[in-house]
C-alpha cells in the first residue's frame, strides 16, 4: 500500500495523495484561492484562512487519480468511489428498460439486481464506465435534490441514465443521481461514443450516488457496506451467480 500512495495508482487510499485535479475543480479552486489572497492582502485574516482551507477542500474534492483497471472481459467494475449502500432486486427505470425510438432494446422490465453506491463529499467524484462498449443511451432527467442515500432518490432526484452495449449483446445500465449537496451532473461523453472499461464518463458535484443494474443471472461480488473504488473494484462477473454472504439485502 505504501507504494500505491507514492505512485498514485488509485487503490482506494491513493486518492488521498496528490493526483491530477480535474479542470472542473481547477476553476473553482482558483476563484476561492484568489479570494483568499485578496482578503489576506486586506488583512482580513478571519476570512482569509477559512477561504484558504476551502480552496484546498475544493481541490481535494475534484482530485482525479489514475486507476488500475482489471483485464477481465467478464468483470463489471464499479463506476464510482464510495460505499455500497443498497443491493436490491428492482425493475430498471423506464429510461433504461424500454426500447428506444430506433427499436434498439433496453434492459427490459424484469427485476434486476441493483447495486447502489453512495459517494460522500470525501470520495473521488469522477465516474467511470463499468464495461467497454458503446454509449447506446444517455438520458438526462431533471428532478429534486433529496438525500442521495434515500431509496426514492433514484426516482425523484436529478439523474442521468447511461446504457453501455457490447457487440456480444451484453448491456450494462447505470444511473448517476445528484444528491442533497450535489446540484449538477457533468457528462464527459455523449450517446454513440465508444468507451473503454474504466474510462471517465462524468462527475457529480459534492455528494451523490450511482446505481448499477447487473444483467440477469449475475450475482453481486460485493456486499452492503463495502467500500469500492471506481474503475478497479469488481462489482460482479457476467454469468457468475454465486451469492456472497451479506450481498442479498
Swiss-Prot record:
UniProt modified residues of type Pyruvic acid (Ser): 208
Compartments where found: Cell membrane
Active site, per annotation: 208
Main location: membrane
Lyase listed as a keyword: yes
Cofactor detail note: Binds 1 pyruvoyl group covalently per subunit.
Cofactor(s) required, per the database record: pyruvate
EC class: lyase
EC number of this enzyme: 4.1.1.65
HAMAP family per UniProt: PS_decarb_PSD_A
Family per similarity comment: Belongs to the phosphatidylserine decarboxylase family. PSD-A subfamily.
Name of the protein: Phosphatidylserine decarboxylase proenzyme
Gene: psd
